[in-house]
Amino acid sequence: MKRVFICFPLGNDVENLIIQIKRYVLYALKCGMAPVVPHFYIWVFHHKEPDEWENAKQAGKSLLWVCDEIWVFGEQMTREMEQEICISKNLNLPIKYIGEDDVDYRLGKR
């Protein structure tokens, strides 16, 4: 399976974040991809200790080097997402922007 980095905006609403992560992971799996989702462990350090948070973000970005593609989800673009996309461009990774309608369709929500 190809590995795909899942890029989407983090939020402060943990419950909604988990729901979105599950949707995007399932979407990637249904597309035959192995999702790489650093949000699962980055959230543990979210804004608790600035040094830990920065290290967690850098660790997440380092996973781009082992991925075959990056898929960008969500309506808004954050600074972190822009950085992940910039790194992906430098690595010549294919970048795919995926709308919520595409996710709903693939997951049979229509």
Predicted feature residues:
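Catalytic phosphate/metal-binding cores of nucleic-acid and nucleotide-processing enzymes, i.e., regions
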Residues: M1-R110
